[in-house]
Amino acid sequence: MKKWWKELIDRPLVKAFLHYYQASDSELTSVAVAYYWLISIFPLLLVVVNILPYFQIPVSNFLKVVNEFLPDTVYAVVAKIITEVLTQPSTGLLSFAVLSALWTFSKSMNFLQKAFNKAYGVAKNRGMISHQLMSLFVSFGLQILFALALFLSVFGRMLLNLIKGYWKSDSPLFDYLQDLTGPLVYALIFAILVMLYYFLPNVRVRRIRFVLPGSAFVMLTLALLLNIFSVYVNNYVNHLVDVRFFSSVVVVVMMFWFILIAKILIVGAVINASVQSLKDKRLRIN
């Protein structure tokens, strides 16, 4: 057993992975990234709240969808809030929410970039201005893609059903588009991951293929965890009948979830660094 273990850790890829993982400082960085993700939720919610009224979504249809996922006691509170949200837009609040979301998300990208740099063994960061501009650019691009993926996953099928009902059409095209919603969401998430691993680290990634292993690992791991999480929510959400208890549980679960996602993203960067180190002499470890 010891001989087998020694042979395993002496393999170049495994040896590189262990080296870069120890250098990544994932324990501390993942908590910092998760913290800024958590506080960025509130301005993002404000953005959604102030955009929805412009779509003129029928309140009754929206409430029917929400009612399917929430227990009755929670729904009574949420329904009142949703009714106000869908009828009272605020342009000033929307501008503030967008700026706040960009700031908090860019801060999380700063910490994630530091973790990626450590994973690649890069001690020197970009200059202050270029560092902030890169974080802002990546944050803005990721938020657009993430918002599109979230919109398709949450509202894609509902929007297609509304269009189908409005046109009163029985065309199989709508069923085909509904079947494409899931794969399209996964394709967008994979594009987000490739963009993240290619642009964020302060290291020259010479080939796109060097970031594909980590992106694929994160994609498959998140898909598995999301399926497990959805099963858990479907089985236990009805037991959370107290609104205050429900809110506190959601915050704790989201913080834990964000820490886990940050750790997985850092492991993805470590995998990419390990693969590239086998091909790039400048990343090769001793």
Where are these regions (language model features)?
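Membrane-embedded alpha-helices and immediately adjacent juxtamembrane helical segments
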Residues: 1-286
